[in-house]
Amino acid sequence: MGFVKFSGSVNSIVSNYILNEKIPEGIFNETIVQILPNAKKDSVYFANKQLIKSTEEENKAFRDIEKDEKKKDSEVSFQITQLKFGKHITSQPLQYYYFNRVEGSALNFNANYRSDFSRIRAEANYGYGFADKKQKYELSYSQRFLKDRTLTLSATVFQKLKTANVEYGGLSRFYNTLTSWFDRNDAVDYYYSTGYDFSVSYLPIPQIRLGVSFLQSKETTANKNTDWSIRKPDEFYRVNPPINDAFQRVVGLNLRLDPNKYKFIDFGDGNISRLAQTKYPYLDLGFQYSPKEIGSTYEYRKFRAVISGNNYVNSLINLRYRFGAEYGTGDIPYQSLMYFNTDPGLAGGSMGFKALHYQEFLGDKSYFINIENNFGKFIFGNVPLLKKFDFIAFVNAGKIEISDANYQLSAWKGFSGTDGTFLEIGGGIGRILDIFRVNLAMRLNNINDRRWHVDFTLDNF
């Protein structure tokens, strides 16, 4: 009657395995991805090889992607801080206009070129200050050679208004313009510098980087030329400190020792990229010599050693740290003295001291420790309005000494060494709008007119 039905199947796979066969040499090496030179195929090849045909919707999506990629090669697009002209050329509109107490209102036109894999990088800047009535320019070029881009040659020619002990541009320069306009606070000091520099760096192996450099610069004092401001028209900007006018020719040597292990991606087109597999700290050693024998006004030597690292353990322990020391001998001009890495109020993102005044401590010997830990969402994770933010705690310590000879040599004496070891602690809220960070820092000693300091910066990534 069909109430009972029996069925069954038998399946057998017979394979021929060879156990413990020796693996050919070169299969497991430091290259984790290797694209063969003839691996690039056109759409006709893949159309003939497809086992499952794409749907019309998928084909349309692929065509749209190809159109978008081709469009990017020639279109003009605007991003948050830059204009893009095609794939390789950019310009920064935030630097087209800026203001400071030396140049007054200033214009700066700039263009940047980056080739694929940044093998070639070129930058051009031309500007003019309406208060100091001086033109400025800076042309730089660098090229990376060899298959893994481990040999780099760089050169720059410049005539510019240089910021003392800090480099800024883009968002930082725009931010300084706003604080000058509305709070009469020009955060940095300036001097004129005209000359050129070039450098060569080479990695014989991933763990060692060698470098040599040469700088020639004629450096002169820049004077304050304006007191204009929107909100405080009856007040005055602080004086721009004089420097030791000098002609400097400086030879530099540097060495990086990096114990980390690396793997590589071979793109098959003559380019190789490195990927770090470990997170050990690395050591940077530097030496600078400015001899009178080759025309320098002042003769001095500077030595530098810095250990840096970043270690992620878990969501609560994400450490970044720097330990370093600098030592100088000879007659060091004011503009070349050692200093602590600190943000003078330019919304910068570098790791360093938070509660210091700009150029407060200078000297010919310095020692510093910077440590911070990102606790992630641990503090604010359950707070509705704050759960997207990170909490960062930091501690910084440092000591700067200045010899009597170099203090007397300095053209400006509005600075000092630290009284013992300077200490500060604090915390910050990061990932504000994904890119900003607010810090609250407290001095534990060397207290002058303030113990607490709040600053607004770009986040560290």
For the regions a language model picked out, list residue spans one by one.
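Short loop/turn motifs that connect adjacent beta-strands in outer-membrane beta-barrel proteins
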Residues: 26, 78-81, 85-88, 114-121, ...
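Residues that define the transmembrane beta-barrel architecture of outer-membrane proteins
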Residues: 103-107, 133-137, 192-196, 245-251, ...
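C-terminal outer-membrane beta-barrel translocator/porin domains of Gram-negative envelope proteins
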Residues: 153-170, 179-189, 270, 275-383
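Transmembrane beta-strand segments that form the barrel wall of outer-membrane beta-barrel proteins
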Residues: 88-99, 110, 115-141, 153-155, ...
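Residues on the lipid-exposed face of transmembrane beta-strands in outer-membrane beta-barrel proteins
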Residues: 107-113, 139-143, 155, 196-202, ...
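Gly/Pro-enriched, hydrophobic low-complexity segments
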Residues: 1-29
